[in-house]
Amino acid sequence: MDKFVVRLPKDDMMKQESKHERNYKQATLESLRRVVVIEDIERYKSILELPGQPKENMIEALKELDKKVPSREVLKSTRIGHTVNNLRKHSDDPEIKSLAKEVYKHWRTFIEEHANKPSIEVRCDKQTESLRSNAKKLLSEAIEMKVDHELVENIEREVFHQSSRLVSGAYRRTVRALVFALKHKPELRVQVKDGKLPVNVFVKSYKKKS
């Protein structure tokens, strides 16, 4: 018996294919609740602990933290639980205090119910950490503060965040631009130190592209 290849019209073929299609929702690794990027946790902690931080920045940080559920180990190593709990107990702002309470309660409940389910932790490699440490040193010298000061850490973490968490050319150029500005613009340096110029706004104004 002869064999024939039957070619359907393009529209008919598309209709048949569509019957077998399935709808998939793409999810990034970071969008999953049990995936915890340590750098993000450290950044939010830095934001919450920096004196004079604008309220909107603190609210945003708490809302982002509420989307994640760090493991007991991450809570201990980063001490983010201590930071949130401190805001829950001692914040003078009712909204911040209430939101911190929600985050703390959410984490505690989730950990108690999922104690045996580990979270996935994403950390920076040693080379990246080394380069970032050098950037912190340059920033600390420019702003005339110790390298472990909360403000220095907050600035560097914001640069890293706005550079898509990559020590790229954009990251290096942004650090250089910030260092130059802090060294040669005394009034700007004072504004950043006093908190009159929020760190995220300061970094964004000097952000360099790749």
UniProtKB/Swiss-Prot annotation:
Per the record's keyword annotation, is Signal included, yes or no?
Answer: no
UniProt cross-references to PROSITE patterns, sorted A to Z = TFIIS_CENTRAL (PS51321), TFIIS_N (PS51319)
Give the organism the record lists. Answer: Danio rerio (Zebrafish)
Per UniProt, residues of the TFIIS central domain are 131-210
Q: Where is the TFIIS N-terminal domain positioned along the sequence?
A: 39-114
Q: Which SUPFAM superfamilies match?
A: Conserved domain common to transcription factors TFIIS, elongin A, CRSP70 (SSF47676), Elongation factor TFIIS domain 2 (SSF46942)
Q: Name one GO biological process term.
A: DNA-templated transcription
| Keyword Nucleus among record annotations | yes
Q: Where in the cell is it found?
A: Nucleus
Predominant cellular place of this UniProt entry's protein:
nucleus
* InterPro entries registered for this protein in UniProt: TFIIS/CRSP70_N_sub, TFIIS/LEDGF_dom_sf, TFIIS_cen_dom, TFIIS_cen_dom_sf, TFIIS_N
Keywords, sorted A to Z: Nucleus
Protein family according to the UniProt entry: Belongs to the TCEANC2 family.
Q: What is this protein called?
A: Transcription elongation factor A N-terminal and central domain-containing protein 2
Report the record's disulfide bonds: none
One cellular-component annotation, GO? nucleus
List, alphabetically, the Pfam families matched: Med26 (PF08711), TFIIS_M (PF07500)
